Amino acid sequence: MSPARLPISRESCLTIPAGFSPSALLDSPVLLTNFKVEPSPTTGSLGMAAILHKSAHPDMLPSPRDKSVRNAHEDRGSRDFEFKPHLNSSSQSLAPAMSDLKKHEHSMQNQSMNPSSSSSNMVNENRPPCSRESSLTVNVSAQNQPVGMVGLTDSMPAEVGTSEPQQMNSSDNAMQEPQSENVADKSADDGYNWRKYGQKHVKGSENPRSYYKCTHPNCEVKKLLERAVDGLITEVVYKGRHNHPKPQPNRRLAGGAVPSNQGEERYDGASAADDKSSNALSNLANPVHSPGMVEPVPASVSDDDIDAGGGRPYPGDDATEEEDLESKRRKMESAGIDAALMGKPNREPRVVVQTVSEVDILDDGYRWRKYGQKVVKGNPNPRSYYKCTSTGCPVRKHVERASHDPKSVITTYEGKHNHEVPAARNATHEMSAPPMKNVVHQINSNMPSSIGGMMRACEARNYTNQYSQAAETDTVSLDLGVGISPNHSDATNQMQSSGPDQMQYQMQTMGSMYGNMRHPSSMAAPAVQGNSAARMYGSREEKGNEGFTFRATPMDHSANLCYSSAGNLVMGP
């Protein structure tokens, strides 16, 4: 190899320490900052004086990177020598190294005179087993043969024509490229079968997130995978552990296998040796970053661990990321099933009352508040909804007219009242018999004073309609129509005690006194009848006499439902 093709580092500036002569550079074809020392093809000397001088004064190194690299040399009892850069070297190890290098310098000069001894030292038998150390062996050949073979146990390429900045870049790229290829290769198949069930954009991430689930029955392991636009996987998160072994290769889902990076990474000796041989110079330039220093990843990854692909643990700060889509769907379905099973509390039996009325609202003794109205299917008449106004009472009812009979009102009650029937309002009492009271006043105003005084006894009396409902039954009973007066028994007893003869005598006397009286306008007085059909007073126009007369009719006491006055008639709703 010609000296022009030897690796020569090109620095932007070169600092020459004091007391150093530039003529020392002629002894070696490499610069001071390059520690990959090779013997001179012309003289065979190594020119280590400058290197030893710089090792004794580390503060005079021209490059900050060289300050962190120290060389420790050991004599292994052979004619070869090795440069072994250590991560944690110090200046204390430089003192014995100086004496060792002097001995190696003399041995190398003797070695150049004996060409036959160079062929027996091509392979280093004392290679250190530690993978974190990189060894460099320099073999010296005959004086008239150019020496350019630098290598480890394996053979190296013949041409090494890269500069030191390019070596640094290649070392960084050599670290990044295996990682990206590793992720792509490891993510191709992890040995399990996955099924994709969702994809969405999450907060704080530019790439969409895909959700996968293990296809094995009863396996709850899920996987969250983020893939960039170019197809590179940026993040993989596993949730849970597999409760089954890996399926057989022939049973794997080849087409639908989802990339992931679960599994154990192992580096055998052959692959490690290949990495060292291909990146020997870059490892010497930057020994901290080495592919051989990658530690194996545990086989299973849980929620609390970092995934093998360099991802981060599953984030829990965002509420939308805590649960995946399938778990949300399952929860919603289970909630719907629970709601369907539980349902609403068991409703009380419904009670339907159908009556014929001109008005929709029937007075059943309770107070109601209307809270809605709508038209139901199959009935053109609207349905009104009412609620009991009593506090805490759950009873409701809805009133509607029948579709087949507009005069029929259907009232449906739901629930039971938990309170007594409220007291009737005054408006209800006054509305019970106002028509009869008006008729009596008309009679009194149109009659003479004597007859009007007699008819005052016929003024209407107000009585309360009594509605009853069983406390613990599902039937609502409404007493519609004519009510029974509470003074009915007293009036009946008085009528019976007077006797039919006495009553007839009194009525005949009154007729004789006012028989000759004529009313200016012939007004027919309304006949007030009880259930016995007894007519106590009335007006009758006869052919011969057109005067106002009274006629007493014998009363039927068997019915026992007569009334002493017109006020006993109670109007129904």
From Swiss-Prot:
A Pfam family annotated for this UniProt entry: WRKY
Applications (biotechnology): Expression of barley SUSIBA2 transcription factor in rice yields plants with increased starch content and reduced methane emission.
Reported tissue expression: Expressed in endosperm, but not in leaves.
Domain of life: Eukaryota
Key word DNA-binding present: yes
UniProt xrefs under SMART domains: WRKY (SM00774)
Principal place of residence: nucleus
DNA-binding region of this protein: 183-247, 357-422
Annotated positions binding Zn(2+): C214, C219, H242, H244, C388, C393, H417, H419
Residue spans of biased composition, Basic and acidic residues class: 64-85, 183-192, 263-277
Name of the protein: WRKY transcription factor SUSIBA2
Organism listed in the record: Hordeum vulgare
